[in-house]
Every structure is written in structure tokens, then in C-alpha cells.
Amino acid sequence: MADSATLDATTVQVLQDLANRLRVHSIRATCASGSGHPTSCCSAAEIVSVLFFHTMRYRQTEPAHPDNDRFVLSKGHAAPLLYAAWVEAGSISEPDLLNLRTIHCDLEGHPTPRLSFVDVATGSLGQGLGAACGMAYTGKYLDKASYRVFCLLGDGESSEGSVWEALAFASHYGLDNLVAVFDVNRLGQSGVAPLKHCTDIYRNRCEAFGWNTYLVDGHDVEALCQAFSQAAQGKNKPTAIIAKTYKGRGIPNVEDAENWHGKPLPKERADEIIRLIKSQIKTNRNLLPKPPVEGSPPVSITNIKMTCLPDYKVGDKVATQKAYGLALAKLGLANERVVVLDGDPKNSTFFEIFKKEHPERFIECFAAEQNMVSVALGCATRGRTITFVTTLGAFLTRAFDQIRMGAISQSNINLIGSHCGVSVGEDGPSQMALEDLAMFRSIPNCTVFLPSDAVSTEHAVYLAANSEGMCFIRTNRSETAVIYTPQEHFEIGRAKVIRHSNNDKVTVIGAGVTLHEALAAADALSQQDISICVIDPFTIKPLDAATIISCAKATDGRVVTVEDHYQEGGIGEAVCAAVSGEPAIHVHQLSVSGVSERNRKPSELLSIFGVSARHIIAAVKYTLMN
């Protein structure tokens, strides 16, 4: 491969020819599928040609090698262009490319990690750069390796605020191994992008965010090579390349024309245009990428053991969010690849304990939750880290799309929500996570933990660290009593029956603070000669349906659920779904019924919303009378 400083005419021609071959592949594939975005592919053909066959270092036969340079296609609708590059690199056959978007083909309309050369799923715009930031941060500060990260964005998606959160993050951490390429083709999906072709405005904005910035003609391969070469020389700043391009480049009467987004060319026109583009190809040569510079350290992130048992005594009063902070610090001792990302509330959520003990593995993302989740997804790619994302549970709702895309990315990130439920008290409704269980229960392959004391919280942290797929741990601000001994064993999907006798009349299921309300209710009811079974589900997803059904049948089908969460999507609905095949089981649900309008103490709010011990007692008596 020629160096950009001595780029010869032959190399320039080969790169231009490769760009045109990428156009041909993209047009053919989208025509074959009858759907797709050929015009979005054509605008970035030269960019991808230069990246894959001149600038990036990688092993073609090992796309996921840890030392390879990374590429993130943030404008995921241009997936055929990415697949075309891998056709030219020899990893995909041309016939396979023609199966684009078919049910048995991994070449989807937007890229996902079902493909070995895709690290994160994209397609929901504005998220690729945040993931690229996570990869670059891992490379620079954790792996201390030579690999670089390139992210291709569309101009339309740069309207997303998450893009600018990522720009701020990369600048703050001096990610000089990161290059963002803005494909400024002027057109969005349904019309003109807000900044049109005003590349100077893009430059000014990127520079204001602390990036080295270069303006280039995005269809000039020589200029692109030079810009990428300059980016490689930059120190302590990320680089933005603002590439002026034209949507549908090379397609007569379509180039720079509106109303062609997401439309394949009619077959008769496509054949003619392919012949035209092919006539401009002067060589049949290819360029091989340079091999990567090896240097990424070997990592092991499986089978992590507790360094010691939880250090709590039954009866100790500890908030589960504090127990989580302490457990995470212990986990950091057990494995040096544990990384924590914080959204700024570390001083009130006990995440600063981890920062104090493992500062080199604590990533402050500030109040930018969307970017924080995207960065975490990037950090976790290629099995480089065990990643925990920490903030108030209410604020994770802002990042739901990033979390959703994380599931599509088959990511193993762990998210922890603190200050959950009305038990936050005087801070008011804006701080109360009351939708979080519904949100995370809806995420495929996501394990949802709801620990009820410090011991179970510590076990939840270790189980999450060793789990495949995404995990969510819900924690509370209120101090609650430790109810389990340090020797207690916990499993995902296995509930704990806390109170049980042969005379139980009703099964009561609570979790977190409401489990303690249920235990208080059980004590009060026992004074009235009414015995109840009390279950701690531990994980809300998967739910231990077998234990719940068994206990419910033993109490003549009478079940009461109580939760510090809205009814929709919460514990009650999860239990109803679990027992839906058992017509003799009837579930009475207690849950938060509305938004708190007043500042009250946690105990007062639990009572106001009908999820206190007093209301559990009333519900038990009601079920016994009906």
C-alpha cells in the first residue's frame, strides 16, 4: 500500500476504481432486494474505498481481531456499501451480496453483530459515534494499543443531540485515535438537511467542540488520503473530516436530487447506470490493507469469583444502592477489566467508591446519558471489558433507544439504576424511577435484578458480571434491613421464599423496599393468627414461575403482589403472565397509581400510593373474603 505522502497516480486510480466498484455492488444488491439505500451508499463510496483499502489496518481473514482498526457505520442505512467493501476485501462473495435483506441472509438492511466485522448495530441514527468513543477510549486508556477507530456519519443524523454529546466526550478525553467522517451530501430522508452543503459551519462546530477538523472533497480520493494521514499525526485531540459529497454520486438525474432516499433504482435504469459506472473503471486491481500493529493485551472476563463473602450481618440497615457501590469496588479487585461509567451522580449513588479504588477504570460521562450508554456499548465490544453503567434509574429512560440498540448489538453491558421508586421521597417525582422495570423487561435477553438487601445486591453484581446478555440492577435509596446471611446462595431466575408455613393463607410477592413492607405485614398478620407466604423474586426477568405457582397453589390460588413501580410492566404484570396458564390462581396487584404531587417522606409516599404494610394487610384480608 502506498503512503499518502507519496501517493502515485496508479494508487489514486485504483482507489477511485474501487469506489466505483462499491457503487456497482450497492446498486446491484439493492435492486436484487427491491429495497435499500443506494444513493446513500454512492455518496460515501470514495470515503469507504480509502478507509478500507488505504488507511485502515486490519486482518481481512480475522475481522474481529483485537488489534484491528475499528470501523463504525453510524449511517447504518448505507449497509450495502459496507458489505460491498467486504466483498472487495474477500470476506463476502458477490452472490451472497445479492441475497441482501433476505430472511436467511445475515446481510441485513442495517448492520448488526451477526456479522463478524460489525461491532455494534446501527441504523437508529446518532449512536455510532458514541460507540466509537467507547472503542477509542478502551484502545487508548485500557488496552493502550495502536488500533484506531473510524466512524462514518451522515449529515442528517448530525441533528441528533447524541452526536454532540459524543463530540464533547471525545474531546474531553483527548481521543486522538478517533476519526469521525461526516458525509455531508446535503440531503436527508425527506428533504434537504438543515445545514445543506455549508461545510464551514460543520467545521466551526467541530472545532468549537475541540476537534482537529479538515474540509475535503469527499469524492477526491487523494484529498481523503491526505486528510486521514493528517489525522494520524494529530495528538491529544480527535479528528473530524468534513467531506462534501453528493447523494447518488455517479447516477445521472439522481445525483443530488431529492426524493431518492431509501429507493432502489428501477432494474432497467440500474443496468444502464452500472454499465456507465463500469465504463469509468480503468483497472481491475485491488489494494491489500496493512496488517495491524499487535499490542492489545490478552483479557479474561469470564468465571469471576467473589474475593470474599458479603460482609453484612442480618439486621444491619444498608441501602441497596450503597451495597451496590461497595460490591462494585470488590468486583474491581476480582477482575482488572471491570469498567464503570457514571453519569455524574457518583457522590450520591456510592459509585465514587469504585472511582477511589480503581480510578483508571472509572469513566465519567457527565450528564449525557444517551452517550454514556453508547460509550459503554463500545467499551464492551470484542470482549475487552466488563462494563457497568451507573446513574439514577429515572435518567436511564432518556437512553432507552441506546439500550434497545444495545440488545440488537447482543451486548453484555450491565446497567444499574439507583434512587428507584417513590421511596426516593422528598426529591420528588422527577427523580423517581417508576417505569424502569417495564422498560428493561421489554428488552430481549435482558436479565432484570431487583435485590432486596445488601447481600442479595452483592450477589446480583457478580451474577451480572458473569452473565451473557444485558443486565439491569434496580437499587433503592432507603436503608433496609439485611435479611440474608453472607452464605446465602443466589441464582438468576430462582426466587427466595422468605416466610412459609403449612398454614399460609395468601402468597405475597414483594421486592426491594416492598419486600420489607411485606415482612412487616406478615409480622402484624401473625398477631391476628393469619399466616402468609412471602416471596422475594430476586430477578423479575426471568421470573421464577415454578416457585410462585407452587406457593400460590398452596394458598388456594390467592396471590398479592406489591411494588414500588407503576402497574404497567411491573412485578404484578410479570406475575400475572407467569400464572396465566393457571386459572385457579388470582392475583391482586398493589402498585404506584400516579405521579407524586407533593414532597413527602418515603414512608408517607409508600402509604399514599397504597404499597405499605398497612395496605398489604388490607389486601390480604380482602382476598380472604373474596
UniProtKB/Swiss-Prot annotation:
GO cellular component terms, A-Z: cytoplasm
Coiled coil feature spans: none
Active-site annotation: 369
Entries under SUPFAM superfamilies matching the protein: Thiamin diphosphate-binding fold (THDP-binding) (SSF52518), TK C-terminal domain-like (SSF52922)
Keywords attached to this entry: Calcium, Magnesium, Metal-binding, Thiamine pyrophosphate, Transferase
Binding positions (substrate): 37, 261, 348, 419, 427, 477
Cofactor comment: Binds 1 Mg(2+) ion per subunit. Can also utilize other divalent metal cations, such as Ca(2+), Mn(2+) and Co(2+). Binds 1 thiamine pyrophosphate per subunit.
Subunit structure: Homodimer.
Protein name (record): Transketolase-like protein 2
The encoding gene: TKTL2
